[in-house]
Amino acid sequence: MKDMRTAEQTIDEVLNLAAGHFKVPREKLSPDDDFFKTLKIDSLQALDLLTRLEQHFHVELPDYELQGVSDFRTLASRIQARL
């Protein structure tokens, strides 16, 4: 069955999960933020976040779809496309 989340709900969930995972206030994150810069994370930490997001949304994101993705909005749209 197709997931009925809206794009905005997916973005909100991505931001909430990232904030909780990295213990930063949710209000410090916005959809167009570069998560590497905003969260001050490296590629291994980003991979950990991606794994958690895949588990939460029950999706698998191929590496080629994530190349060059660094903002929450684009990441959420890639997730949304797989729901």
Short names for language-model regions:
Residues 45:
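Two-component histidine kinase catalytic core, primarily the HATPase_c
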Residues 2-41, 50, 55-56, 60-83:
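Phosphopantetheine-dependent thiolation modules in NRPS/PKS and related acyl-activating systems
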